[in-house]
Design a protein with these regions (language model features):
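Conserved ABC transporter NBD signature motif
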Residues: 56-64, 72
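Conserved ABC ATPase "signature" region
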Residues: 96, 100, 107-125
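Conserved catalytic motifs of ABC-family nucleotide-binding domains
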Residues: 150
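ABC transporter nucleotide-binding domain
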Residues: 173-259, 279
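Catalytic Walker B motif of ABC-type/P-loop ATPase nucleotide-binding domains
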Residues: 154-157
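Conserved ABC ATPase signature
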Residues: 129-133
């Protein structure tokens, strides 16, 4: 359903997306995992014909994204990262305007709107003005709008960004429902590890380069071993470094990857490391990302523009 061949985007000499090649099968939920600035949104903009690529090629639903852009647009739906509803209109009016843009007749539009609103459990508020909606309700309405014209492929750019964990889980129920009920192909960008876990396959993107594509389980299995977590105190950092025990800082913890858990813990005790609160776990997607890129995903997301956009988004979601 989606295929790219060395897809590239440059902005004034800066390479935002660097010769990215991958494919997404029909009915697949494909997750694009990476921090802000990794090239996720730029890739979506190229695939949805909003931005012409600087190089390479891409196909969506069998159509070239450059030479057959109209055919691509007819077959896709988009849920943008930033809110794009007209908050002065009602839920029904927002969807009806979308139906007009896609040439859906009035009678057919009414039936589709009723079905879409029922799908995301908003039929009871269909005549309420959107500015009265919570952030989660607005996101559900955007999902309904994105699927109103029954696209073959639905692109979701950070669909739960700015939402609380409980609301994120609810939104994910609707996303999975689209795949299971309608068999739609889903291309989703995220920097939330728990969301990437729901994907059939994940593409890890870092600084514009596609590092790896595989299932979540295969990515974790390939890393191998176990992870020992202990408190990231200055004393622990110094003692592990002096003993040549490699550790990566992750939030308030030091993570030591090892194939020999018992031997490594014994060595930590011998060097006098603080073992209070120590835990042992199997590799996570966070560990995979760190191993492949050298940094935690949160450490890559602090550019000023991204922070400003996040603040604006949070205000709109309230």
């Amino acid at each position: 359903m989606i295929r790219t061949d060395k897809l590239t985007m440059r902005f004034n000499g800066f390479v935002a997306v660097d010769k990215v090649s991958f494919s997404v099968g029909e009915g697949e939920l494909f997750g694009f995992l990476g921090p802000n600035g990794a090239g996720k949104t730029t890739t979506i903009k190229m695939l949805t014909t909003l931005l012409p690529p600087s190089g390479g090629r891409g196909w969506v639903a069998g159509h070239d994204i450059v030479t057959e852009s109209d055919a691509v647009r007819d077959r896709i739906g988009i849920i943008f990262q930033d809110p794009s509803l007209d908050e002065r209109l009602t839920a029904t009016e927002n969807l009806f305007f979308h139906a007009i843009l896609y040439g859906i007749g009035r009678k057919d539009a009414k039936a589709r709107i009723d079905k879409a609103l029922a799908m995301v459990e908003l039929k009871g508020v269909k005549d309420k003005v959107v500015k009265t909606f919570s952030g989660g309700m607005k996101r559900r309405l955007e999902i309904a709008r994105g699927f109103l014209h029954m696209p073959s492929v639905l692109f979701l750019d950070e669909p739960t960004l700015g939402l609380d964990p409980q609301t994120r889980r609810v939104i994910w129920e609707y996303i999975r429902g689209l795949k299971e009920t309608f068999g739609v192909t889903l291309f989703l960008t995220t920097h939330y590890m728990e969301e990437a876990e729901h994907s059939d396959r994940i593409g890890i993107i870092h600084k514009g380069k596609l590092i790896r594509v595989d299932t979540p389980e295969n990515l974790k299995k390939a890393l191998g071993g176990s992870a020992i977590a202990l408190r990231a105190t200055d004393d622990n950092v110094k003692k592990l470094a002096n003993a040549d025990i490699d550790a990566i800082r992750e939030d308030s913890s030091l993570i030591v990857k090892t194939e020999q858990v018992d031997e490594t813990i014994k060595r930590m005790v011998e060097i006098g490391a603080d073992m209070m609160g120590i835990s042992v776990r199997q590799p996570t997607l966070e560990d995979v990302f760190i191993d492949m890129t050298g940094s935690a995903i949160g450490e890559e997301s602090g550019d000023a523009m991204g922070v400003m956009r996040a603040a604006v988004r949070m205000r709109r979601m309230r």
